[in-house]
Amino acid sequence: MNVSFAPLFLVTLILLGVVSNNNSITISATILLLMQQTALIQFVPLVEKHGLNLGIILLTIGVLSPLVSGKAQVPPVAEFLNFKMISAVFIGIFVAWLAGRGVPLMGQQPVLITGLLIGTVIGVAFMGGIPVGPLIAAGILSFVVGKG
């Protein structure tokens, strides 16, 4: 008997999202549960293939939108030479590199995704994190278990 625990897992995520007042988990898990339980299941492979990229695009739009609205200004070149700005640039490079290591690891060892997701959910639900953690977590994990 082949039983899928995905619906139970999604309901658990929905409950965790409600209890922790985390709309991103609640909405995401609800949409996936509705897709899984209806004819929308046919679009799950499309979400699986393109969802991460679309999510990163939306996140980037959200981060850049204050520049467009005028709420944030592009700093003058001279400000790029202070310690905080230089640190921000190097940390941004490092985190992007970590995420770049994480994506191949998730593809090569997909069983690790479950652990990364559980850790991310706990971090989002109970520690005030945001669900961008799996990529960075996979990048850090690549140092522990080896890349690929």
From Swiss-Prot:
Its principal location?
membrane
Source organism of the structure: Neisseria meningitidis serogroup C (strain 053442)
Q: This protein's superkingdom?
A: Bacteria
UniProt cross-references to InterPro entries, sorted A to Z: UPF0756_TM
Name the UniProt record assigns to this protein:
UPF0756 membrane protein NMCC_1816
Signal peptide positions are: none
Where does it reside? Cell membrane
What membrane topology term does the record carry? Multi-pass membrane protein
Q: Which UniProt keywords apply?
A: Cell membrane, Membrane, Transmembrane, Transmembrane helix
The UniProt similarity line reads: Belongs to the UPF0756 family.
Report if keyword Transmembrane is assigned. yes
Q: Which GO terms describe its cellular component?
A: plasma membrane
Give the PANTHER family listed for this entry.
UPF0756 MEMBRANE PROTEIN YEAL
Q: Please indicate if the UniProt record lists Transmembrane helix as a keyword.
A: yes
Transmembrane region positions?
A: 13-35, 50-70, 80-100, 121-141
